[in-house]
């Protein structure tokens, strides 16, 4: 079995409301010097073949109109 990690995040130029909310709260919590926050999600899969993971991302895991994704192979 192969292990794959898919990182999904909003595309550049798309409003990331969660990221903006965290970014706005940081100074009030004493965190200075952090200028840009983007929040996404991580999906980890185990599969016999990873050939169709990109297709899975396009059709189910990510919204290709507003999200980018990156596929990483996880080494044991």
Where are these regions (language model features)?
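Short hydrophobic/aromatic beta-strand micro-patches
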Residues: 7-9, 44-48
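Short amphipathic alpha-helices in soluble, non-transmembrane regions
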Residues: 19-26, 52-61
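Short, surface-exposed ligand-recognition loops at beta-strand->loop->(often short) alpha-helix junctions
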Residues: 8-17
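Positively charged, small/polar-rich N-terminal and surface patches that mediate targeting and assembly
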Residues: 3-5, 66
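A general secondary-structure signal for short beta-strands and their flanking turns/coil
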Residues: 1-3, 40
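A common structural junction motif
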Residues: 26-31, 61-67
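Amphipathic, hydrophobic secondary-structure cores in small proteins
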Residues: 31-44
């Amino acid at each position: 079995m192969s292990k794959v990690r898919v990182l999904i995040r909003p595309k550049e130029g798309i409003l990331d409301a969660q990221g903006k909310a965290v970014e706005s709260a940081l100074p009030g919590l004493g965190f200075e010097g952090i200028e840009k926050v983007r929040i996404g999600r991580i999906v980890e899969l185990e599969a016999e073949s990873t050939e169709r993971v990109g297709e899975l991302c396009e059709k189910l895991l990510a919204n290709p109109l507003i999200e980018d994704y990156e596929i990483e192979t996880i080494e044991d």
